[in-house]
Amino acid sequence: TAYLGQPGDGTSPADRFNDFQNSLTTLVNMPSSNGAQTSVALAAEDLVRSVKGAATTLSTTLNDVNMEIRYEVADLNTALYQLRDLNASGSGFTPGSLEAAQFDEKVDTILDQISGIVDTRIHRSSNGSISLYTVSGAALLEGRVVQDVTFNPSDGTLMAGNQDITPFKDGVRGIQHGSLAGLSELKRE
């Protein structure tokens, strides 16, 4: 309604259609009236302008949402590769040392960033390596193997490697929370 207006505000496509319909009713009752004929033509022009304006606004909004999803996917992949690199470097620091605390802080910061984008489940192996999965079980990172997340703007599909993680899609291990789920919901609407 922010883009289309509210019914009754005088500017929404619904109001323009109502004006057009009313002008047609008047024309039916007074077919020879030049004023009624002109009124229909003007109301039709207003309706077309209103619908075109709404379509342009919605198209721009869809493009903006697609761009935001691309940014979030890029940020997610960057964070997954950073986490993979930390896995590869290992945390062979003395427990309780400054280096160990700094390493853990880096890992926690990256995990916080990722969990803001997608809902995750973390598994730490006995050697300290981190594997990361969506809550529904799709792998994002397993040790040193990153499942690149991709986005297809034409149909809204999100993939982690070969696994479909598109939110709100039946039969897939879709993400449920985080900014990608929210943006996907916005795209669907």
Model-derived segments and their meaning:
Residues 1-189:
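Structural signature of extracellular appendage/secretion-system components
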